[in-house]
């Protein structure tokens, strides 16, 4: 029986890494073959000295699919240990058991499973089949549910707790606020219609840094 959120989340992180990193490795090998062996996995055409070579059939979008199939679970590979540490620190410094511990554990299981079917929300403007966008928008909104559950449970753990505002606790509170802001911006970017005009803007940069950059570092 795992009674530590940190231990539970680190374990699930290893499972995610086990399934996510092979996609990155395969895409790197295929790209190496394109460069050295003149295969055509990702490159649709090749021009040398102004002449089109007999070279075709590759798809740059295939590389994006492989990269983001790794890339989105990798966000949680980075964030899950932070989730577990924050849960344990909040419980300790609020002098309360973590609210809904079993739900927190199952929320991480749900996040881990869903993280493998949301990758193409990074690719709404890449040229992929637009009908796929609506499927991935739906799964992206669904993954927000267990993520929000963790935030609610952190807040409910603090509710009426004997809170000690030590330095670790202040960092945890900063994590919650930062991650909450990052998650709310993600709701906009997960929607196909809203994401298209926001692509390549600082809105995306802010979302990335609040979720992936600042929050886990805190």
Where are these regions (language model features)?
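Single conserved hydrophobic/aromatic residue that forms the stacking wall/gate
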Residues: 1-7, 11
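Loop-to-transmembrane helix boundary motifs in multi-pass membrane proteins
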Residues: 100-110, 162-183
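Hydrophobic transmembrane-helix microenvironments that flank and shape a buried ionizable site
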Residues: 6, 69-71, 147-150, 206, ...
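Short helix-boundary/re-entrant hairpin motifs in multi-pass inner-membrane proteins
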Residues: 9-19, 26, 56-120, 149, ...
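Hydrophobic cores of alpha-helical transmembrane segments in multi-pass inner/ER membrane proteins
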Residues: 76-84, 140-153, 211-218
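Transmembrane-helix bundle segments that line or gate the permeation/cavity pathway
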Residues: 1, 16-38, 84
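Long, K/E/R/D-enriched contiguous segments that form extended
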Residues: 122-177
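Membrane-interface interhelical loops and short amphipathic "cap" helices
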Residues: 28-70, 93-98, 117-137, 161, ...
